[in-house]
Curated annotation (Swiss-Prot):
Coiled coil: none annotated. It catalyses: L-histidine = trans-urocanate + NH4(+). One of its GO terms (biological process) is L-histidine catabolic process to glutamate and formate. It comes from Pseudomonas fluorescens (strain SBW25). GO terms for molecular function: histidine ammonia-lyase activity. This is Histidine ammonia-lyase. InterPro entries: Aromatic_Lyase, Fumarase/histidase_N, HutH, L-Aspartase-like, Phe/His_NH3-lyase_AS. There is a cross-link at A145-G147 (5-imidazolinone (Ala-Gly)).
Amino acid sequence: MNVTALNLIPGQLSLAQLRAIYQQPVTLRLDDSATAQIEASVACVEQILAENRTAYGINTGFGLLASTRIASEDLENLQRSLVLSHAAGVGEPISDALVRLVMVLKVNSLSRGFSGIRRQVIDALIALINAEVYPHIPLKGSVGASGDLAPLAHMSLVLLGEGKARYKGEWLEATEALKVAGLTPLTLAAKEGLALLNGTQVSTAYALRGLFEGEDLFAGALACGGLTVEAVLGSRSPFDARIHAARGQRGQIDSAAAYRDLLGESSQVSQSHQNCDKVQDPYSLRCQPQVMGACLTQFRQAAEVLVVEANAVSDNPLVFAAEGDVISGGNFHAEPVAMAADNMALAIAEIGSLSERRISLMMDKHMSQLPPFLVGNGGVNSGFMIAQVTAAALASENKALAHPHSVDSLPTSANQEDHVSMAPAAGKRLWEMAENTRGILAVEWLAACQGLDLREGLKTSPKLEKARGILRDKVAFYDKDRFFAPDINAASELLATRCLNELVPANLLPSL
């Protein structure tokens, strides 16, 4: 696997870099420009302690216990106790890729110099990242305010020599994991435990994974939709640039252009029916630019929110070293992330819903002008009959999963934290939705290629022929019924490799 080398200038991560960090290991170096601000924030914390001033998160308790002053001799124990007590997550461990993304996001935030955390602690996180040592972070346990406390506590445990981490696929006790990275357990100073735990990095990583998978699905859906247009002898007219310019919706305009690029001006298939008597295609064909354009807009808007959050300081309290102030606020509240994830859920659901309708269209011989269920000798053979049912089941699941999470809230911490974002749940359900939509698109890809193969050897456009060839290298034509599930799985696995992304125009999607 390739390793991305990254000189991190705090607050300047791009979406393309974030995608690369998620997809492959990274060798991280913190730019020298970060040092002065980091040291200034630490000096500010030390000055507050030297002057015996009371400051939340530095020498007080936390949450509802914020008014409790902590004695100087207990400050180190306070930070350690905070990490241990807050490591209360449950569920399966998240993937190495997600842990890596979380850790880089945390380093990026802490290195902005508003957190009062020593360079030594930040460097320890970087050493773990570079050694590909990934702390055990359970999937569940955060409500997205006050930050992602439980999962980030699990991440931080390893720095203290507690918990466990994965290295080359094997779980190690924390002390052994630290040795792999050339580290020994840390003793956290005042403010440092809270700085590690407070923040929206897990929520943001969950949503970023949803964005990346959503973008890949979008690209795949464009190709599959184009193949279906050709398979059912659809018209190119609805993709005419003048239609979309008249409306002015940028996502729609760009999606229509992508379809025109995929379909080309004409093909053997389109020439075969240019004098037909059809007036209009069904909406699932004709309105693809409108529906997919709206989805593209959601991804683009979510990307804008998430790249800001990936570079944000979401700690609390914040240290403003120049003024000598430590101020409590609410940057840990992940509402922007939750809403971005909710909007992406709508887009992922609609991509699948539209695809399922195109599959259904291909099943109907009156609409498609193809054999019923895309197979010869109907009756003996059932063809794609139940594959379409599977697609319908997946589309239906996504409709329920698309329910917004950001409108939900449960008060926590004895009502001190009385409104929360539910951003982690909003983000992680995107992965299940993406898997469902990938399954739907897999069925459409299979069906559209089958339909084209039934068109007596006629060829479509060069790009769509490439999409057909990629599938046909793995899955053969259906001349009669066979065990169907392996073919759906094969097509879905192909989609997961992002093999159709290269067929869409560059810069169409935010992180590609």
